[in-house]
Every structure is written in structure tokens, then in C-alpha cells.
């Protein structure tokens, strides 16, 4: 018997948007990728934690005006079918959330424009319309399981009635949830998934959420 899904939790980068990494996208937009590449390599080698990586990355953007950041974000397109998916889920009274190890300024924008019930991500510090270089790290790649459980408790929806949609294994951390890999980036994501969607249209997830 198909399971009933009452809450869908989406990854953002590479899932709801076509940009695989907002961090890399912004480094390229702000011409800070030389530093960003070094920091990413340190993180991949295990020399710094995700929190340290995010904090040091954010400092690269100290002094950038908020308007410049917003102009860059407006260039990021949603994945094909994203709006349709949220409209359909809303019509069926299914709750939706966005959990991203990226940045809240894009996650919150996506939540407003797509109609998600909740967004959780990392928050850049802004003062007088300028990036201060600070950041509040709320989501790391290793903490998504805890955040999913917190959201489950918040909405009083059991894990068995939650679907997770993402492009990487860390987006699909809990076995009790339905795990949908959308445009999976590697074999680890494929092996974690109950369902694999290789099509570029996010609406391919809908038959598994009914």
C-alpha cells in the first residue's frame, strides 16, 4: 500500500534551482572565487569544519551591498516544474519546507515565491544594507537529519509521512522517510534513494507524493 505523504522537504541548490552551489555562484558573481576555491578544497580535505568554511566564505563578501546580492540572486532560475509542484502540493494540503546548507536569503526568497511553509538555512549578517562578513550557521551538510526531525516535531507529522527531495545523499538522511533523488549528482545519492528522477522537470516527483 502506498504511503501517505503529508510533508515534503526539499533541498534548494540543484533541486529547486538549477544552480548546484549558491556559494560558488556568488563567488563567481562577486569575483571572489580564487579565495572560495581554496576554502572549498580545505573543507573537502577535512582541514576545516563546515561551520568554519561558511564563516570564512562569508567574510570574503564583507562590504558588498545588499542590492548587489539581490541582483545576483534574481539571475538564478527555478528548476522546471518547481512552481507546478508547490501549487499541486498546496492544493492537496501537503506541507512543504526548504532545508538548505546554502543561504537563507535565497531559501526565504524561494519559500515566498513558491509558497513553502518553512525555510531553514544559513543567515548572512546585514547591517545598513551592507554584508558585514558575518553569518549564522544553522544548517551544515551533516545536520540535515536533525533538522528534518525538528520539522517533523514542529508540524506533528511522523517521519514515515515525510518525503525528502534532493540531489545529494546528505539531502536524504533518514531511512523512515520517502527519499527521492532528483537529478542525483553521484552514486551515493542514488544508493540512498527509494525513487530516482533523472528528468530535468521537478514535476516528475508528483506521482510518488500522491
Annotate the PLM regions.
Residues 1-56:
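Active-site neighborhood of HAD-like aspartate-dependent phosphohydrolases
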Residues 90, 112, 190:
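Anion (oxyanion) recognition and catalysis
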Residues 109-162:
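Substrate-recognition "cap/lid" segment bordering the active-site pocket of phosphatases
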Residues 96-101, 159-200:
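Acidic, Mg2+-coordinating phosphoryl-transfer loop and its flanking beta/alpha structural elements
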Residues 66-98, 102-104:
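Short, acidic loop-to-helix structural element flanking the phosphoryl-transfer center
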Residues 121-126, 184-189, 201-205:
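Short, acidic/turn-prone active-site loops that include or flank metal/cofactor-
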Residues 53-69, 125-131:
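Short, basic/glycine-rich phosphate-binding loops at helix/coil junctions
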Residues 25, 81, 105-109, 173, ...:
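Phosphate- and divalent-cation-binding pockets in alpha/beta enzyme and binding domains
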